[in-house]
Amino acid sequence: MIHRTLTVASLLSTLAMAQGTTLAYRVPFQLDPSRGAVLETTFDLGHRSGTEPDLLVFVDPGAERDLLLAWFPEVELVRSGVPFGAITPTVPDPGYYTTAEILQQIDLFVAAHPDYARRVDLTTLPGAARTHGNQSIWALVVSDNVASQEDEPAIVLAAQHHARELNSPHVVIGAASRILSGRGSDPVLATLVDDYEIWLVPCVNPDGVNHVWAVDDFWRKNRRNNGSNFGVDLNRNYPAGFGQCGSSTITSSQTYRGPSPASEPETQTMRALIASVRPEIYIDIHSSGREVLHTYAPCLPPSATIDAFLDRYLDSLRSPMNYAARDPSASGEAPEDHWTSSGTLSFLIEIGTAFQPPFAETILEEVRVWPGLRQAFTTWRPAVRGHVRSLRGLTPLEATVTYTPNQFSHGEVNRSRARDGRYAMWLPLGNWRVTWSAPGHESHSRDVVVASYDNPLAIDVDLLPTSVPATLAIAGSGRVGTAVGITYSAPGDVGLGYWIPLSLGTSPGVQLDGRTLPLNPDALMAASLSLSPVLENNLGVLSGTSTAVATLNVPDIPALAGVTLHVGGLTLDASFPSGIARWAPPTAVTIQP
């Protein structure tokens, strides 16, 4: 009997190697914690913990299988992967989606709700790419006025980074159905659709899913050709913490992280989506375990402040579903990357207790998961929302937004959206110094007090373009009855207007677009618009050298001796809200007897 079992196992293994399919092994007894930890951090498990009884371990034929058998010789081969489309007698369940059926379902939503739903090929976004199998990755966008890109926050819900997790797309498609069908009768969902842009991505890994249906129901990875084997674990391929823990360099491994961060087209496409829409919330659906994962991998722990802050939202997500919480299995996962690179509040949900349970169980699981998703989408709100724009033309900027005291240690950064400058900041309660920065512009900082959660402060910021500083040069003694030469230089401002005014003081100045022009708006300044012949050539167009020369003819009035005039130089530009682009620091001229 033992010989027969070994022979069957050998045949299955040989067949798996020939077909490139996955092997499932069973651990026949419960491991002690130390061995369980090794198993959990090295291999792909069908359960949440390496110490659970009756544990399934999935490996590819070759080096990974050899490593498993060397370290855990007690494991028993269950079977190799087979085409999911050929499994009998009860599955394939007609409820599970092939990639073609997912696209068909998206099209049905669009046909039924043309004003609120549209299909988008994510691989056409800047920085995205078609899969190794030359496939698109499709999204359903839900919003009012869905044909246009409105200035409103975004949410992303995605599934099936791992191909075999056939129950995960049903949660995304179920959410789409609930939102679209419920918006007409549910005021909360109506507000969600009116105020947000919701991106639903049922399948991130179409090549892998096709392989599940046609060849191997255990298949996890994408279909990169590694030479002697195939596939990269997409949820180990993201740049945040790439290779730090929980992934493998063995190409045949179920958790092979790929040759480099974001090497895979599917990863590139999802990162392109995040960069394009800068969502406030990202939720990733996986299976299985009935858990919500912490955002940070255990090898890259956050500060205590950020950990407690994220736990608040994790608990808000899992409680309506009665799910547990746990650490991620590895670094390089999507939620950590989207939080780290964009400031998007991100979590991963492991649904159900199997990858492909009877479809009736998946239907019930979607019902169980929806209240958590609904709570996240309709109640979670960032601490601060707003826009970052350039003062020149009020054009939107893709800016970085940071704050102090710094609570981050892994390169985390928040970014605004390029198309409209919209940003969102998720901040713990407290007093913070927030700084907005963009290339070619001066940074701006201000104090922000976060007194309550999910009650956003509205802060729009206009940044001043940087340039070589403008200067003023004064020539002449300033004696009564003499002329004083005034040269205003504003490098780069060729052809723009200029104004060289006078004022009797510099404080409190004039408030312009959040800036302070250090000249008082007194009668002398007003008269500077038409003070000829006392002030000549002080209003005009900057020359080809970005300079202007004006003349102050000091009246021959002895009583003026001792009076101090403050001379300014301003560049005029109608693309700025105030019409004033910049100025040189004012220079004082004291009239001499």
Please identify what each model-predicted range represents.
Residues T466-P593:
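Residue-level hotspots within well-ordered secondary structure
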Residues L429-G440:
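A short, solvent-exposed beta-strand micro-motif common in secreted/extracellular proteins
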Residues W213-S390, L397-E398:
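Metallocarboxypeptidase
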Residues Q19-T90, G514-P518:
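Extreme N-terminal flexible tails
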Residues G421-M425, L457-I459, A548-L552:
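Short strand-edge motifs at loop-to-beta-strand transitions and within beta-strands
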Residues S168-V212:
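Short helix-loop-beta-strand segments that form the rim/entrance of peptidase-like active sites
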Residues T395-P428:
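Short, acidic Ser/Thr/Gly-rich low-complexity loop/linker segments typical of extracellular
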Residues P439-L464:
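Structured interaction patches on ligand/partner-binding surfaces of diverse proteins
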